[in-house]
């Protein structure tokens, strides 16, 4: 493979064996595609805003004389860009403008149009998605998590014998629409069929059929076959259908007309008997009279002569009834064919319990069930039933639901109306009865063919439709009220309900979540998350084991490893690496097509439904050079089972071994050697890693690090190829290659870097360039690293030298022993940025003021504030320091005589304000790195606000000038080249300014035209930049739009540097987590023969029981990788010949039998030098999951690095110098510092707030709460007999109010006694008992 210039800086050695047929798709595409589908108008109107508008419009007035029609919509430009929105705390959104047409009909002449008015109407703001798939809502980045919900359609299920005490299996069917009422059919223990609507009380199922205009006769005709009997001359003949006799016991001799007996009475009829009967061609059979008695009639019988009904359908036949029928002239009698085995009498029985006899009665019955207590009228009952399943406004199956419905009940087409039809309801009942009869299976609701993904776009569309429907009602009212001649569309529409619905969804829906921004991985994983919770989904409490379990259809679609531990396990999942959603919202995964035993490179995406029909080989099946299977029998999957089949039976093959797992799990090297429980912890803990000060690429990775860092959007990736012409810490400028330019543009790309900003988790986001001026750049190259990336590779932690051995009990129970060197080198130091804000409001007593003049505060406390009362940038502050001085007016208080006297003398009114300054919270120390001041429109800006504004303007001006200068240089450069080619003197041209340069005249017309084009381009550029700057200036100087009652907001940003310390939590990538117990001086750490100490000591007992052996293999491989780097460093120090260095690097890349080809010979000398420089710290290695390095490859690497093949080393005790008695596994492991820092958790309460009712101290660090002295702690003190301590704990230290105050007074007076009284919680208990009506009184003894 050919590497670009920047990829050659450091190449990761890959141990993957399988060729990569398909690159990992863009990781955020689910989110971006879904939202694009929502915003971009689509011609069919199937989805997005277009679909919402078309479903609600046109809105007709009640009279029908006017209607409001929808024409089109457009989305305007956002006012602020993403960064400005984050700083100002506003939503990144754009206005939605809709073109509407009001059509008014002529009342006098119906059908003629009187007036048409068209107008563009504002319909609120629509939040926009950023390039990285997030939304900025009120200044914070949020992610809308996709939801996995039950697909609309029809489902057949059974209760597995749990409902009825007899254990009988009861079957049920449920029609779930996308919106509208649910329709359930269910059997009871007596085999009657019932219907429920919206889970209300059940009615016999025949009621809904009657309401659909079916008579009893029709119903029996639909659900039963008939058996016809003919009664002639006292004989009863049955029309014979031989196959129906099978399995029955003959109640009489079955014989032909000539007397040949086929089956004797009492014998069971077998298939052989039936064959003989069919061969004979017998059509009728004489049966005894008893055989027909008890049969059920299939239709109504009427006496033709009198017109009276002799018998009704579903009546049971008796001898008397039979005689009457014959008398009335009915010699042929149709009865229902009922058979216990495969054709039960369910509908017949149901009709017997159904009390209704006409359509109206059925409708009334349904109305009573839906609206109990309301008097039913014919029209109301009719309208209610019509609206339930047959009205487009109230009921929609959606295209997905219709497709699923049709395929399940066996229709030929995929499409159809969104509402139900009579036939649909009958089909569902037919399938349910067939399943009860033993034909067909019930559905598996956990199958991914029955669960679909609902992404951002779809949820936003639903929410938007809700808003539109609210508006629709109001528009109808207004259309029928007003004088339509004077009204415009704008007067009819109120945008408030729409923007309220959208805002509510983005701001407070359960699926709109605060983005997890610890590191790039946590961002990507959050956007790829799939939740079964949320509106219309499951709840934690109701979700059983089956829903949470890994299902066979998860393969390649949902990761079986990555899911949270705890109550949400299995309900929140992650998308697999290659998975995507199809048009219907079902998850698909790619497979390579196999033709006649040869695996092709053609890739098909299959959904869970399609996959079941095929035979699919695993990705690790052995293939020959020509892509044929090596083995005769191949492990494969077919119809949800794992099995072995022949090579010619294979139809598809997995694309990649990593296809099964999610991105986070694919980052774990040697995953195949870890137990799944630990791998789960590993993938979850990588998301909690805090970006370290200096990112360090993992020595042992999996090869997916680069893709993930690029796709996450934290790095800066080149949009087009070119050459770096300028580069500093905040900007990179690339001069684009001629062939990649758009004709007529300057051809310069400017990338601005993000510097030291705060993430959602208070970690630090900072980008640093990785390129230098003059370097060539290819499209897709990484130009700048973000947090937790190193030369474009994801780098969540640090490579530390680890030894597995016990060390004086300091690594007991997963504790971790760390060397002081790690602290000194700042290997695990992180920067955290906190935002504190001070708000000045308008109160009833007057407005709050931000000032440095604060009552009762000494000079020293104000030392870090400027004259406006705001802390200066760069100040180092600790807890309790004032950051922003603020005073609040306080109500008039009763003055003491002394104060009155002072007032009278000095006339001062200053004491009627109280100090409400913003102070640094407890246990925080840091440096102020930024201050932002926001002032309400119309409020005068203070000095500090003006300074901030001036600085922002200065920076903006400088930025724009630099950008303009760069682009100008590009244009002028091309103009000079043009003029020089035309014979102008280069030196003279250098003296000309832009104006003169571009107004030269040339002899050749085409050249002149080109120069004029450049001049026009230059003018355009200048105008554009002037406009841009003016825009920016306006945004900076205008007042801010603050919440009602807020005059000013000051935001202060503190940066805190946190070194690693005992109590911090660390982890590897294999679920091996622990807390640092102590940090040991370097000289006391174990060291090897060369005197190199280890950085970290882990307990070997943590490995065997947890079965995460991957960490041991990683340690060995890390040692080899580092060793090879050290050898390269030695060669460079000794200044060896370049060809030796080249040969060694080549040898390192050629170890093992991998797919990777690195053509070291084609590298230039400079490239080799640069590569070697970057490999000094160790040769980075990729060992992909399920396709990684084998044991002997690790041993070969160790050998090349000059280490023993065992990977074990002799160590010496740092304190005594004695050798440890056996060799120790030493190597390099990638360790992460997790965002569970002791600084954030350590807390002690002195005096603080109490709970209002119980008067006990509050709990938790945020409330400055106390530690709960619980039940078990009380037992412990009881066991020690420490009565006084216990009394103190339960009274004065907790909720004895009088005792507390007395105790305080005593301490102040130096009288160390305590007088415990009655705890307040006893009073609460008394009140609670009294509330039950039991009076308790305490008596003094």
UniProtKB/Swiss-Prot annotation:
Its EC number is 2.7.7.6. Pfam families: RNA_pol_Rpb2_1, RNA_pol_Rpb2_2, RNA_pol_Rpb2_3, RNA_pol_Rpb2_45, RNA_pol_Rpb2_6, RNA_pol_Rpb2_7. One of its GO terms (molecular function) is DNA-directed RNA polymerase activity. GO terms for cellular component: DNA-directed RNA polymerase complex. The keyword Transcription applies. It comes from the Bacteria. GO terms for biological process: DNA-templated transcription. It is an enzyme of class 2 (transferase). It catalyses: RNA(n) + a ribonucleoside 5'-triphosphate = RNA(n+1) + diphosphate. Keywords: DNA-directed RNA polymerase, Nucleotidyltransferase, Transcription, Transferase. Belongs to the RNA polymerase beta chain family. DNA-dependent RNA polymerase catalyzes the transcription of DNA into RNA using the four ribonucleoside triphosphates as substrates. The RNAP catalytic core consists of 2 alpha, 1 beta, 1 beta' and 1 omega subunit. When a sigma factor is associated with the core the holoenzyme is formed, which can initiate transcription. This is DNA-directed RNA polymerase subunit beta. It comes from Pseudoalteromonas translucida (strain TAC 125).
């Amino acid at each position: 493979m050919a590497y670009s210039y920047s990829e050659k800086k450091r190449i990761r050695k890959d141990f993957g064996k399988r060729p990569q047929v398909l690159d990992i798709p863009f990781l955020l595409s689910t989110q971006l595609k879904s939202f694009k589908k929502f915003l971009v108008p689509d011609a069919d109107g199937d989805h997005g805003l277009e679909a919402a508008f078309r479903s609600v419009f046109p809105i007709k007035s009640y009279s029908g004389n006017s209607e409001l029609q929808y024409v089109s919509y457009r989305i305007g430009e956002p006012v602020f860009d993403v960064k400005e929105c984050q700083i100002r705390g506003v939503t990144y959104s754009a206005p939605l403008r809709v073109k509407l047409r009001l059509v008014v009909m002529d009342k006098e002449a119906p059908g003629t149009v009187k007036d048409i008015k068209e107008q563009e109407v504002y319909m609120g703001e629509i939040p926009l998605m950023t390039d990285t798939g997030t939304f900025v809502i009120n200044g914070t980045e949020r992610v809308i998590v996709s939801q996995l919900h039950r697909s609309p359609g029809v489902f057949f299920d059974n209760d597995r014998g749990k409902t009825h005490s007899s254990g009988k299996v009861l079957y049920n069917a449920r029609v779930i629409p996308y919106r509208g009422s649910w329709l359930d059919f269910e059997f009871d223990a007596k085999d009657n069929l019932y219907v429920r609507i919206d889970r209300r009380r059940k009615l016999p199922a025949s009621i809904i059929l009657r309401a659909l205009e079916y008579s009893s006769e029709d119903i029996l005709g639909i659900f039963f076959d008939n058996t016809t009997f003919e009664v002639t001359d006292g004989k009863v003949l049955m029309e014979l259908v031989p196959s129906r006799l099978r399995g029955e016991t003959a109640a009489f001799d079955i014989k032909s007309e000539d007397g040949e007996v086929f089956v004797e009475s009492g014998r069971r009829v077998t298939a052989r008997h039936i064959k003989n009967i069919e061969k004979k061609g017998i059509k009728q059979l004489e049966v005894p009279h008893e055989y027909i008695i008890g049969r059920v009639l299939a239709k109504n019988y009427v006496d033709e002569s009198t017109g009276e009904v002799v018998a009704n359908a579903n009546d049971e036949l008796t001898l008397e009834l039979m005689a009457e029928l014959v008398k009335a002239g009915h010699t042929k009698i149709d009865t229902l064919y009922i058979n216990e085995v495969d054709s039960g009498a369910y509908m017949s029985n149901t009709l017997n319990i159904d009390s209704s006899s006409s359509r109206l009665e059925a409708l009334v019955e349904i109305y009573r069930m839906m609206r109990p207590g309301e008097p039913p009228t014919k029209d109301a009952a009719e309208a209610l039933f019509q609206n339930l399943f047959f009205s487009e406004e109230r009921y929609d199956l959606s295209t997905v639901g219709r497709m699923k419905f049709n395929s399940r009940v066996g229709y030929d087409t995929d499409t159809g109306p969104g509402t139900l039809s009579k036939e649909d309801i009958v089909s569902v009942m037919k399938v349910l009865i067939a399943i009860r009869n033993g034909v067909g299976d019930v559905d598996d609701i956990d199958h991914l063919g029955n669960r679909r993904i609902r992404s951002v776009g779809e949820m936003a569309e639903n929410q938007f439709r809700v808003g539109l429907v609210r508006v629709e009602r109001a528009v109808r009212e207004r259309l029928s009220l007003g004088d339509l001649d004077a009204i415009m569309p704008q007067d009819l529409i109120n945008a408030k309900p729409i923007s309220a619905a959208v805002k509510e969804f983005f701001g407070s829906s359960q699926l709109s979540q605060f983005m997890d921004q610890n590191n790039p991985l946590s961002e990507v994983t959050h956007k790829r998350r799939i939740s079964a919770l949320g509106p219309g989904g499951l709840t934690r409490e109701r979700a059983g084991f089956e829903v949470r379990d890994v299902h066979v259809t998860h393969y390649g679609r949902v990761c079986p490893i990555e899911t949270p531990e705890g109550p949400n396990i299995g309900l929140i999942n992650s998308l697999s690496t290659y998975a995507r959603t199809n048009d219907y919202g079902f998850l698909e995964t790619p497979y390579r097509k196999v033709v006649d035993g040869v695996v092709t490179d053609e890739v098909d995406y299959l959904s869970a439904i399609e996959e079941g029909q095929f035979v699919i080989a695993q990705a690790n099946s052995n293939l020959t050079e020509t892509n044929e299977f090596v083995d005769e029998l191949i492990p494969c999957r077919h119809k949800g089972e794992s099995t072995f089949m022949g090579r010619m039976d294979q139809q598809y093959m997995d694309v990649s071994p990593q296809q099964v797992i999610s991105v986070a799990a694919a980052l774990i090297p040697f995953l195949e050697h870890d137990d799944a429980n630990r791998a789960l912890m590993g993938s979850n803990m990588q998301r909690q890693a805090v970006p370290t000060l200096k990112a360090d690429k993992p020595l042992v990775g999996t090869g997916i690090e680069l893709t993930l860092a690029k796709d996450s959007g934290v790095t800066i990736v080149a949009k087009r190829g070119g050459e770096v012409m300028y580069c500093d810490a905040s900007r990179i400028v690339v001069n684009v290659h001629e062939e990649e330019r758009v004709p007529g543009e300057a051809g310069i790309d400017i990338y601005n870097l993000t510097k030291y900003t705060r993430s959602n988790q208070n970690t630090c986001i900072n980008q640093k360039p990785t390129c230098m001026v003059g370097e060539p750049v290819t499209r897709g190259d990484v130009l700048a690293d973000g947090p937790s990336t190193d030369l474009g590779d994801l780098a969540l932690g640090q490579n530390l030298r680890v030894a597995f051995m016990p060390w004086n009990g300091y690594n007991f129970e997963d504790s971790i022993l760390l060397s002081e060197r790690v602290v000194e080198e700042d290997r695990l130091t992180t920067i955290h940025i906190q935002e504190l804000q001070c708000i000045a409001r308008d109160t009833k007593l007057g407005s709050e003021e931000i000032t440095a003049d604060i009552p009762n505060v000494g000079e020293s406390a104000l030392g870090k504030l400027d004259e406006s009362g705001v802390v200066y940038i760069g100040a180092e502050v600790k807890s309790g320091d004032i950051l922003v001085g603020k005073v609040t007016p306080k109500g008039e208080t009763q003055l003491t005589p002394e104060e009155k006297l002072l007032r009278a003398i000095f006339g001062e009114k200053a004491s009627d304000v109280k100090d409400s300054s913003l102070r640094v919270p407890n246990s925080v120390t840091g440096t102020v790195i930024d201050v932002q001041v926001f002032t309400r429109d119309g409020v005068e800006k203070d000095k500090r606000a003006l300074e901030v504004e001036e600085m922002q303007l200065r920076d903006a001006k400088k930025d724009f000038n630099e950008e303009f200068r760069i682009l100008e240089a590009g244009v002028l450069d091309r103009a000079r080249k043009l003029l020089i080619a035309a014979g102008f003197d280069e030196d003279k041209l250098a003296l000309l300014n832009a104006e003169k340069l571009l107004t030269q005249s040339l002899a050749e017309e085409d050249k002149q035209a080109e120069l004029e084009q450049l001049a026009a381009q230059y003018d355009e550029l200048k105008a554009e930049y002037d406009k841009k700057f003016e825009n920016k200036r306006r945004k900076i100087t205008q007042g801010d739009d603050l919440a009602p009652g807020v005059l000013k907001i000051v935001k202060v940003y503190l940066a805190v540097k946190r070194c690693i310390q005992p109590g911090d939590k660390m982890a590897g990538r294999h679920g091996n987590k622990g807390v640092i117990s102590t940090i040991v001086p370097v000289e006391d750490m174990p060291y090897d023969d060369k005197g190199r100490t280890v950085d970290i000591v882990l307990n070997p007992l943590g490995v065997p029981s947890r079965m995460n052996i991957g960490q041991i293999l990683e340690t060995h491989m890390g040692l080899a990788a580092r060793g090879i780097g050290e050898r390269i460093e030695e060669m460079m120090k000794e200044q060896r010949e370049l060809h030796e260095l080249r040969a060694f690097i080549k040898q390192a890349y050629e170890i093992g039998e991998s797919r990777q080809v690195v053509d070291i010979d084609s590298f230039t000398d400079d490239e080799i030098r640069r590569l070697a420089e970057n490999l000094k710290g160790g040769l980075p290695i990729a060992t992909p999951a399920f396709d990684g390095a084998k044991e002997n490859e690790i041993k070969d690497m160790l050998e090349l690095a000059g280490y023993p093949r065992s990977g074990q080393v002799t160590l010496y005790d740092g304190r005594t110098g004695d050798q440890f008695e056996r060799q120790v596994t030493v190597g390099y492991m990638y360790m992460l510092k997790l965002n569970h820092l002791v600084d954030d958790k350590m807390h002690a309460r002195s005096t603080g707030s109490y709970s209002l009712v119980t008067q006990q101290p509050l709990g938790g660090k945020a409330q400055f709460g106390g530690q709960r002295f619980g039940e078990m702690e009380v037992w412990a003190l009881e066991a020690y007999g420490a009565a006084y301590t216990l009394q103190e704990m339960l009274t004065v230290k907790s909720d004895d109010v009088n005792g507390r105050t007395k105790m305080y007074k005593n301490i102040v007076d130096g009288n160390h006694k305590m007088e415990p009284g009655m705890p307040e919680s006893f009073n609460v208990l008394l009140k609670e008992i009294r509330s039950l009506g039991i009076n308790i009184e305490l008596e003094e003894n």
